[in-house]
């Protein structure tokens, strides 16, 4: 089924920054997709095209990307008469038309916007739900509901507190269904709010970009202690484990790490990667930490490798791998991590996202699907995680509508699957294992 019309516009994301939205029309109707955007971005990500016109949106406008779709990509696709079911052909055509390594001609935000809309239209054309269409594109016969990783305490570049590490997450792995995982997550979240309010005052329960709390604490183990207390208070010590996203590239300074990077710089307090690794090992020993993302800088390969060989938990590459097949292959070869963080806008098309996921899985890695800190009401990644059977998703706290949009969509998908719904639970690292 051919595309009839492609139209892009500039909308605002959850942080009040412009982003790209695409409407694609076929005989089956209108299919709309919006592109997310990150705050802590890896230097190897595909290029997000911004206008740079300081008189509009502080230079963050996306009218150039929108124009690339409306004047170039859209007309070229309509002329080519590709079917919306042929995701790979459509994506390949756009990537070749762009012709750059990192999509800098049109912008990954332009190409991805069209790619996502095409995927939604393709599902409608086949008359199947989006998650089933994605599963077909990936060659997956089964469908799996993921364990949600709720980012409930925020630090790093996402928050105005002193906390260096960016995300402290709870994973209800002991739940029996996705819906139950949502309830457990929400209950722990509310208990956490009470614990923080009692200890630090009401203003400490204001929420960050992803709906988590950002109390003004400096010590990272204090955040873990708060989680432990809230999990106990909610009555789920046997069902909830902890994940972290350190985003260490944000505080890497001349070969060392600064755990107080939001204060005036003082090289005397910078620590080595090895020392930081010891700190993580203490966290693993003292708390139910099962997953650590970006524990070291995106180019500090040697430290990643030596750390991975000394722990048996999930070590996730995000800034390290940026959903890019070349970086993933490098990380596999160096044995740097054992899980990929999958962000569609880091690579810039649905096809390449699926390829990155399959490359990681074929090397025995786990895969965690992820939102960005600047999100929209678009729910594509909810269907994506079910279709790709990755078993885990992080899309913020159970708070703020742009986060709940994804979680609520996952509850609907579970409901639609009925008896056939399979929840990853404790097998979140390798949900396909029988």
Swiss-Prot record:
* Residue ranges that the Swiss-Prot or TrEMBL entry lists as coiled coil: none
Q: Which cofactor does it need?
A: Mg(2+)
Per the Swiss-Prot or TrEMBL record, the active site comprises 210 (proton donor), 343 (proton acceptor)
Q: Name one GO molecular function term.
A: magnesium ion binding
Reaction(s) this enzyme catalyzes, per UniProt: (2R)-2-phosphoglycerate = phosphoenolpyruvate + H2O
Sites where the protein binds substrate: 158, 167, 293, 318, 370-373, 394
Question: CDD domains attached here?
Answer: enolase
In the record, Phosphoserine modifications are located at: 83, 157, 176, 263
State the oligomer form and interacting partners.
Mammalian enolase is composed of 3 isozyme subunits, alpha, beta and gamma, which can form homodimers or heterodimers which are cell-type and development-specific. Interacts with PNKD.
Protein name, entry field: Beta-enolase
Give the organism, scientific name: Bos taurus (Bovine)
What gene is it encoded by?
A: ENO3
């Amino acid at each position: 089924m051919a595309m009839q019309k492609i139209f892009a516009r500039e909308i605002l994301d959850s942080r009040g920054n412009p982003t790209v939205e695409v409407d694609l029309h076929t005989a089956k109707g209108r299919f709309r997709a919006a592109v997310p955007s990150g705050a802590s971005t890896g230097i190897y990500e595909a290029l997000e095209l911004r206008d740079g016109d300081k008189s509009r949106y502080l230079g963050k406008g996306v009218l150039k990307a929108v124009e690339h779709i409306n004047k170039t990509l859209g007309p070229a696709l309509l002329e080519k008469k590709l079917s919306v079911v042929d995701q790979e052909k459509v994506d390949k055509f756009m990537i070749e038309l762009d012709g750059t390594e990192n999509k800098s001609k049109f912008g990954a935000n332009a190409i991805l916007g069209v790619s996502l809309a095409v995927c939604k239209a393709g599902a409608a054309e086949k008359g199947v739900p989006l998650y089933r269409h994605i599963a077909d594109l990936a060659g997956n016969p089964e469908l799996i509901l993921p364990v949600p990783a709720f980012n409930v305490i925020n630090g790093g570049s996402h928050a105005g507190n002193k906390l260096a590490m960016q995300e402290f997450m709870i994973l209800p792995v002991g739940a029996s269904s996705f819906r139950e995982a949502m309830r457990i997550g929400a209950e722990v979240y509310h208990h956490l709010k009470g614990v923080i309010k009692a200890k630090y005052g009401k203003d400490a329960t204001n929420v960050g970009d992803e709906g988590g709390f950002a109390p003004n604490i400096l010590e990272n183990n204090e955040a873990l202690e708060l989680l432990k207390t809230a999990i106990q208070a909610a009555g789920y010590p046997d069902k909830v484990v902890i994940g972290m996203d350190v985003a260490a590239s944000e505080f890497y300074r001349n070969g060392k790490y600064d755990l107080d990077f939001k204060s005036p710089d003082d090289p005397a307090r910078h620590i080595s990667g090895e020392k930081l690794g010891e700190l993580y090992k203490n966290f693993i020993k003292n708390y139910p930490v099962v997953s650590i993302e970006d524990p070291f800088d995106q180019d500090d390969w040697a430290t990643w490798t030596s750390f991975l060989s000394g722990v048996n938990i999930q070590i996730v590459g995000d800034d390290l791998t940026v959903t890019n097949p070349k970086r993933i292959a490098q990380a596999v070869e160096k044995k740097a991590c054992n899980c990929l963080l999958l962000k569609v806008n880091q690579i810039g098309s649905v096809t390449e996202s699926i390829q990155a996921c399959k490359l990681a899985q074929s090397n025995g890695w786990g895969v965690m699907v992820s939102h960005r800190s600047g999100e929209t009401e678009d729910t594509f990644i909810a269907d994506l995680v079910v279709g790709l059977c990755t078993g885990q998703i992080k899309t913020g706290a159970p708070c703020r509508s742009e986060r709940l949009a994804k979680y609520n969509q996952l509850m609907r998908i579970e409901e639609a699957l009925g008896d056939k719904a399979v929840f990853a639970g404790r097998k979140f690292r390798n949900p396909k294992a029988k």
